[in-house]
UniProtKB/Swiss-Prot annotation:
GO cellular component, one term: large ribosomal subunit
GO biological process terms, semicolon-separated: translation
The protein's name in its UniProt record: Large ribosomal subunit protein uL10
Keywords: Ribonucleoprotein, Ribosomal protein, RNA-binding, rRNA-binding
Species of provenance: Staphylococcus epidermidis (strain ATCC 35984 / DSM 28319 / BCRC 17069 / CCUG 31568 / BM 3577 / RP62A)
NCBIfam families: PRK00099.1-1
């Protein structure tokens, strides 16, 4: 086999492994963005722990097939970049949805969450959700509220009894 074909097979294997290991993937069309804007997007994604790469559509198509992800073919037209995260489910969608609001040239094509293809609208919806840490803190504040309110009530009753005792 020629070295070029071997290199392409290796790249397909790498992309397939990346798709299998990621908890969420967002596929975008970056056409129309300036180099500075793409650099800014890459920087924001890197800070969020998201890997962002541009691949040829045929490579992604073969890698998706190898990874067992069906339904991506219709979205793999034109320039394609893939943002994947192995840790935070919301991070790629959050960063890209926020960036797309500021830069209309960035078009969300589709996403993959837990092996299922989701629409661009669903990616934007996921992007509007708080992060895992944000959700945990919201849950904790909801759980603490009754205890905190009870403590305030006990304190108020205690202060009221002190005033009446004087």
């Amino acid at each position: 086999m020629s070295a070029i074909i071997e290199a392409k097979k290796q790249q397909v294997d790498t992309i397939a492994e990346q798709l299998k290991n990621s908890v969420s993937t967002v596929i975008v069309d970056y056409r129309g963005l300036t180099v500075a804007e793409v650099t800014e997007l890459r920087s924001q994604l890197r800070e969020a722990g998201v890997e962002y790469k541009v691949y040829k559509n045929t490579m992604v198509r073969r890698a998706a097939e190898q990874a067992g992800i069906e339904g991506l073919d219709e979205f793999l037209t034109g320039p394609t970049a893939i943002a994947t995260s192995t840790e935070d489910v919301v991070a790629p969608a959050k960063v890209i949805a926020g960036f797309a609001k500021e830069h209309e040239a960035l078009e969300v094509k589709t996403g993959v969450m837990e092996g299922n293809v989701i629409s661009a609208e669903e990616v934007k919806t996921v992007g509007s959700l708080p992060s895992h840490d944000g959700l945990v803190s919201m849950l904790l504040s909801v759980l603490q509220a009754p205890v905190r309110n009870f403590a305030y009530a006990v304190k108020a009753v205690g202060e009221q009894k002190e005033e009446s005792a004087e």
